Every structure is written in structure tokens, then in C-alpha cells.
Regions:
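Transmembrane-helix motifs of polytopic, lipid-linked glycan transferases
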Residues: 226-229, 317-338, 376, 380
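Membrane-interface alpha helices of multi-pass inner-membrane proteins
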Residues: 397-412, 423-426, 442-448
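Glycan-recognition surfaces in beta-rich domains, encompassing non-catalytic CBMs
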Residues: 13-243
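Membrane-proximal stem/loop segments at transmembrane-domain junctions that anchor or position
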Residues: 460-600
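Extracytoplasmic catalytic/substrate-binding loops of multi-pass membrane glycan-assembly enzymes
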Residues: 176, 269-281, 289-301, 309-313
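Loop-to-helix entry region of an early transmembrane alpha helix in multi-pass inner-membrane enzymes
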Residues: 213-218, 296-300, 308-328, 345
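Membrane-interface anchor segments at the N-terminal boundary of transmembrane helices
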Residues: 206-217, 313-314, 553-655
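Short acidic/glycine- and proline-prone juxtamembrane loop motifs at membrane-interface regions
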Residues: 359-369, 411
Length: 713
């Protein structure tokens, strides 16, 4: 082990200790802004502020002590400060606080006499209905059936703290009048005259005082700059671990944070989150009437697991274990290559604290094991890359890779081209190991044939129906009709045979209007699919623009944020007035008793948080960060470019393969705006963040070692 000189100046250490105190104050205030509610000074708020303050002081001091012990080359300080500042600005901007609660709002309603009656029901501050006892009344109001009514000049005023989303509820109908509403200084007049009587809810997003925003942004930026700077200095100062033989299964410890947090989420949303797709597969597994519309292999796994314990929770636990073991195995492999265990724990915690993982891992979807398998493949490909292909030369490893690509091809139908293309890429990239790569490809083909051939026939698995199997073909034909493409008489007749020309529907966001069109003659396309594939290809050759537009429309999930197409995120629905205040199972089927939270106290606050991130109108920045697959891909590509700059090896592109091919296939053959389709890209992005931390640390240590050797010479 090379003893490095202690190059930290005493002034720098003193400055760091002063910054720790200020950082902890700013950090605890920033956390307070994230969690503040209507009651600004409560036991909960005090516990959060004090707890976060002492946590930051203790953690930062521990890291400073370690930095002083191991030493830190001061010349690297600029390399730390710049990314720390940029990340801090990013976090301070993208993580919004509940800042609206830090200012007092005044909401007033004035009836305009002579216009008619005003019926007012109440105010909701975004969290709850405001008690009517808090209203200040002026003029003559009648109060009956929890409603305020007046025909004369009268007013209602409420003063208090609220979220930035506030709503007022009135009644509209014949004879109703006009009211002047002041939304904390923003005045508008609203008429409630209507032909029919009904309830009307007026929503308003209240602006936050710019001074409060500046304070929040400044404290957040300072806190993150100092904390990230200390964290990076600590990581860089870590000495290279002594190379020793690791104990068998040493990597399993990294699964603990993930198993703990995901199990906690399962207890909150017990027995697991289930959509309509989940419940269809659950029913098939229990009736043992299998179809391949949802991959039959995944349904078989559900059948197998529920034969041990007949509960959705058993499936979720299996997903948690699969996820945690794959990630921890990947971390263990990096540690074998010299990564300090501290970075390993940081990677594990990164996966464990992600709200995207909290919600998705406990949802029973085929996309979850598929996405984890994509991550597993990426980890394996990094092993292949880092050994220049030699990893393939062991029979155990070849079988492992064959099983991995087999799972990818069986968990989702679009996984087959991913598996094939990656296998072919290995054959082309590593000539010395070509026979091993070919053997893996052959082994994969044999395994897949055994499952989809003899096994499926034995179990009488029904194939996909025509509307599923040829949905993309139908979608592209619909795109040509939407764009008024010029058709020959023969083409018009062939299209009319499938669906009458007047009944074709096109949506830029989903394939459902075509796939579930009641006029679709599925027998026609089933009996002669080649005919309609040729028809779609002919239309493309005649005029490719409608096809390209269709791909750009429905494939926007992959590469952009399309406000026209609302993404589907989760079956989790926030219901603040219900008991429980959320639903996470779409409907009830045999064997499913409904939502049965084991920790019901956490359901409301956690679901409220998720619900706000689901919306583009609430926590917009968190919505982009958590639920926009295009952001996953952009961050992934940026990190890959940084890794490529460090490694300077073109073969590194291999580890980008699973995410890139998956994204390309979804761009070309997407069917809906479901975020889960690209969940695998999110997991790979998190793994790339871990790779970057390791590569960054390794590169700095290598440079330091080289400079020391040059100095000796």
C-alpha cells in the first residue's frame, strides 16, 4: 500500500468545520421546507429539524476525520468543487419544497348584488377541507346543509396557510349570480349561471413569494455544495483496499438496505400493488388457463410461487429478492476489482432510497423481473468488457449468460430481439471467444425452444390473439388513414375487409383504439397475416411520412416529454376522503381480499407524495426526474460519455447495449405510454452512476500513483 502525503492544509480543515455547522443549519432548514405543513411549529417539525441537524453534523464530522486520516491531494479540490456545485444547483432546482406553507394566504369571496344567488360550500387547502368555523363572514349569509347562501352584498374571508394548490366549491345553476373572488390578491369575477344545477370546483395555483424561493434555493445550494464536496473528498481520499480473497457470498450484505426498504413498502401497500394486467395473470395462474398475450412464462412463475404461498405478497417478495440479489452481486463484482466498500454501500443505498424503486418493485408486473434481468445482463456485460471477453471462457459463466438472455426473451415479447442482438454483438466483438459466444447463442436458442415449444404445447398455452400479435401493423395502417394517404382500390378494399374504412381510429399516444376496435375482423388477419404485413410495407414505400410520424408520436415515451400523452405510472390512487386513503389494487378477483396495509399510518402521507409526483401540475420537477423515461435515457447517455472519456475504450459500448437496444425497440414498436416499459433503463442508469463513482475514484488514484512514481524518478 502506498503511503500518500497529507496535503490538506490546516486552514482548509478549519474552513470545513465552520462550513459543517452552517451546512447543517441550511440542510435542516431545507429538510424542514420539504416537510412543512399547515402547523409550522409542531413536534413533528421540531423532530425533523433537530434530527436532520445532528445527522448532518455527525456524518460530516466523521467524513472530515477520515479525510484527515487518509489525506487528500489538494490539487483535486477544483475537480470536486465544480461537480459538487453543479449537482447542488440541480438538486436545489429540481426538488421543490412545500414553500407555500411559509406564507399566510388571504382568500375572500364577495357576492355582487343584483346578479343572483351565491351558494358557497367551502375551501380545500390541498390537504383537507377548511373548517367553516375559520371563515370570517360579513353581510347577510344563510347557513344550511353545510352551505353558505346569499342574495345580497356579503363576503367571506379566510386567512391561513395552504399548499399552492387551493380550491373553492360552489353550486352553479339557474338563477345563480356572480361573485368576486380574491385569490391572495389576484382578483377575478366568476358567474355561476348555468342551465342545470351542479357542483363546480374552482382550482388555483398560488404563486410563492420570490424572496422565499431565493432563500430556499440559496440554502439548498449551499447545503448540497458543502455536503457533496465533503462526500466526494471522502470517497476520493479512501485508500485502495488491500487485495484479499473475499469470503464466499460477501456481496450479500449489500442487499440489506434494499430488502429492508422494499419490505417496508410492501407492509405499507400490502399485499402488493396490482393493475388489471396483474389480476388477469393472477386469474390465469389460478385457473391454469394460460395464454401468451401476457407472457405465459411469467404467469407460470406466478403459479409456481403461489403454490408455495397463495398470496400476492409472495410474488412481491420474490421480486424484492431477485432485485436485491442482482444489484448486490453487481456491487460485489466491482468490489472484487478494487472498489472501496464505502462506494459499494453508497450504490446499494442509491437503489434502496429511490422512490421509483419503492413503488415499482412492489408492483406485480412482468416488467419488473424483465427490467431486473436487463440490469443483470448489463452487469454481466461489464464483466465481459472488463476481462476483454475472458469471462465467457468458463462454462458456468456461459450458462449464466444463457439463462439471463433466456429470461429477457421470456418475460416480455420485445425481449427476444434484445436477447438475440446482444448475443450476436458478443460474437462480433470478441473474436478470440467467438466459439463461446456462439455456444451461448445456441444454448439460449435450445432453452427457449424447450420452453416455448414442448413445454407450452404440453400446458396447452394459447397463442396471442391477432389484435395483440399484429397491433403494430394495424397501427401503421391507421396512421396512413389518419394522414389521408392516397390508396389504390385494392388497398382500400383490403383495409375495409379488416375494419370498415369509417371505423378506423388513430391515437398518437396508444394503440388501444385499434387493438380493441369492435369492428376488427381478427380472423382475416390471422388467416393471412403476410398479406397485411405486405400491405403495411407497401404503404410505407408509397409514403413513409405517416409511418415516421406514428413512430415519433407513440415512441415519444423514449426520447421526449410529450404533454399530449399522459403517461401511465401506477395503479396507486390517492383518495384522501376514503378509508384507507388510497387504493392500489384495480379490482377484486378470487383470492384477492383487497388492500390490507400492515402500517396504515404511512399510507396517506406516502400516497399523497406519490400522487403529487404523478402530476405535471404539482411537483413538476420530481415528475420529470422520477417518471419520464426520456430523462432516464438522457442521464444514462451523459454518464456513458463520462465513462468513455475516462476509459477511452470503444468496447465500453457493449455495456450500453441492453439499454440502447431496449430503447430502440420501444421507439419502433411501442404500444402505450407506460413508464414501466422503460424501467430497465432506469435501473441501468442507477448502475451507471455507481460505475462512474468507481471509475472516477480509480482514475484519480491511478493519476496520483503515477505522479508519485514520476516524482521518485
Amino acid at each position: 500500500m502506498i503511503n500518500r502525503a497529507k496535503r490538506i492544509s490546516k486552514n482548509l480543515i478549519t474552513l470545513m468545520h465552520l462550513q459543517i455547522f452552517l451546512m447543517s443549519i441550511c440542510g435542516s432548514f431545507w429538510i424542514y421546507c420539504l416537510t412543512v405543513e399547515e402547523n409550522m411549529i409542531s413536534r413533528r417539525s421540531l423532530a425533523i429539524v433537530l434530527g436532520s441537524f445532528f445527522f448532518f453534523v455527525f456524518t460530516a464530522n466523521q467524513m472530515i476525520t477520515a479525510i484527515k486520516k487518509h489525506g487528500f491531494p489538494q490539487k483535486h479540490l477544483n475537480k470536486v468543487l465544480i461537480p459538487a456545485f453543479l449537482l447542488s444547483v440541480f438538486f436545489a432546482m429540481f426538488i421543490p419544497g412545500s414553500l407555500s406553507y411559509l406564507q399566510t394566504r388571504i382568500i375572500s369571496i364577495e357576492s355582487i348584488p343584483g346578479t343572483g344567488e351565491i351558494l358557497f360550500e367551502g375551501i380545500n387547502n390541498g390537504d383537507k377541507d377548511i373548517p367553516h368555523s375559520q371563515f370570517v363572514l360579513t353581510g347577510d349569509w344563510d347557513y344550511k346543509n353545510a352551505q353558505f347562501s346569499t342574495n345580497t352584498a356579503a363576503g367571506i374571508t379566510w386567512t391561513g396557510r395552504t399548499s399552492n394548490q387551493i380550491s373553492l366549491t360552489f353550486q352553479k345553476g339557474p338563477g345563480m349570480g356572480t361573485a368576486r373572488i380574491s385569490w391572495d390578491g389576484s382578483v377575478e369575477e366568476r358567474s355561476f349561471q348555468a342551465d342545470e344545477s351542479s357542483q363546480i370546483i374552482l382550482y388555483k395555483t398560488l404563486p410563492v413569494n420570490i424572496f422565499i424561493k431565493i432563500i430556499y434555493f440559496s440554502t439548498g445550494t449551499f447545503f448540497f455544495t458543502v455536503f457533496i464536496c465533503i462526500l466526494l473528498c471522502y470517497v476520493i481520499s479512501l485508500p485502495a483496499p488491500i487485495l484479499k480473497k473475499n469470503s464466499k457470498g460477501f456481496w450479500l450484505k449489500y442487499a440489506i438496505p434494499m430488502i429492508f426498504t422494499f419490505s417496508l413498502m410492501l407492509m405499507i401497500y400490502y399485499p402488493g400493488i396490482m393493475s388489471g394486467d396483474s389480476l388477469v395473470q393472477w386469474t390465469q395462474a389460478h385457473n391454469f388457463q394460460l395464454t401468451d398475450q401476457h407472457p405465459a412464462f411469467h404467469t407460470l412463475l406466478i403459479w409456481l410461487i403461489t403454490n408455495v404461498w397463495d398470496s400476492p405478497a409472495a410474488i412481491v417478495i420474490s421480486q424484492i429478492l431477485f432485485f436485491s440479489l442482482v444489484v448486490s452481486w453487481g456491487i460485489g463484482n466491482l468490489q472484487k476489482k478494487g472498489m472501496p466498500p464505502v462506494i459499494g454501500w453508497l450504490i446499494s443505498i442509491l437503489f434502496a432510497v429511490s422512490p421509483v424503486n419503492w413503488l415499482t418493485v412492489i408492483t406485480i408486473w412482468k416488467d419488473i423481473p424483465y427490467s431486473v434481468s436487463l440490469l443483470w445482463l448489463t452487469i454481466i456485460l461489464f464483466e465481459v468488457y472488463s476481462t476483454n471477453g475472458k469471462w465467457l471462457e468458463k462454462i458456468r459463466n456461459s450458462v449464466l449468460l444463457s439463462i439471463c438472455v433466456l429470461l429477457i426473451s421470456l418475460f416480455r415479447h420485445n425481449g427476444l430481439p434484445v436477447a438475440i442482438l446482444i448475443s450476436v454483438l458478443l460474437v462480433l466483438m470478441f473474436r478470440k471467444q467467438r466459439k463461446w459466444s456462439i455456444a451461448i447463442l445456441l444454448l439460449f436458442c435450445i432453452f427457449r425452444w424447450m420452453v416455448t415449444g414442448p413445454l407450452y404445447q404440453k400446458l396447452e398455452v394459447e397463442p396471442m390473439t391477432a389484435n395483440y400479435q399484429y397491433a403494430t401493423t394495424l397501427y401503421h395502417i391507421a396512421a396512413h388513414l389518419e394522414q389521408k394517404s392516397i390508396l389504390t382500390d385494392q388497398q382500400s378494399n383490403e383495409i375495409n375487409e379488416l375494419i370498415p374504412l369509417d371505423d378506423w381510429e388513430y391515437s398518437p399516444c396508444s394503440i388501444d383504439p385499434i387493438m380493441w376496435n369492435p369492428h376488427l375482423d381478427q380472423a382475416k388477419i390471422s388467416n393471412n397475416p403476410l398479406k397485411y404485413l405486405q400491405l403495411a410495407f407497401q404503404l410505407f414505400l408509397q409514403d413513409p411520412i405517416p409511418d415516421l410520424k406514428a413512430v415519433a408520436d407513440i415512441g415519444s415515451l423514449v426520447y421526449s416529454v410529450n404533454p399530449q400523452c399522459k403517461p401511465y405510472i401506477s395503479p396507486l390512487v390517492y383518495k384522501p376522503t376514503a378509508n384507507p386513503p388510497a387504493s392500489w389494487i384495480d379490482f377484486i378477483v378470487d383470492g384477492i381480499k383487497g388492500e390490507q396495509s400492515k402500517i396504515p399510518e404511512f399510507v396517506a402521507p406516502l400516497t399523497k407524495f406519490f400522487d403529487r409526483t404523478f402530476s405535471l401540475n404539482s411537483l413538476t420537477s420530481l415528475h420529470f426526474l422520477f417518471w419520464c423515461p426520456a430523462i432516464y435515457l438522457i442521464i444514462l447517455l451523459l454518464i456513458f460519455l463520462l465513462l468513455l472519456r475516462i476509459e477511452k475504450k470503444w468496447t465500453l459500448i457493449l455495456i450500453l447495449g441492453p439499454a440502447f437496444i431496449q430503447s430502440l425497440i420501444m421507439l419502433l414498436f411501442n404500444v402505450a405510454q407506460d413508464v414501466r416499459f422503460q424501467y430497465g433503463v432506469y435501473l441501468i442508469m442507477e448502475y451507471f452512476i455507481g460505475l462512474f463513482m468507481f471509475f472516477f475514484w480509480k482514475n484519480l488514484h491511478k493519476r496520483e500513483k503515477d505522479s508519485q512514481q514520476s516524482a521518485r524518478k
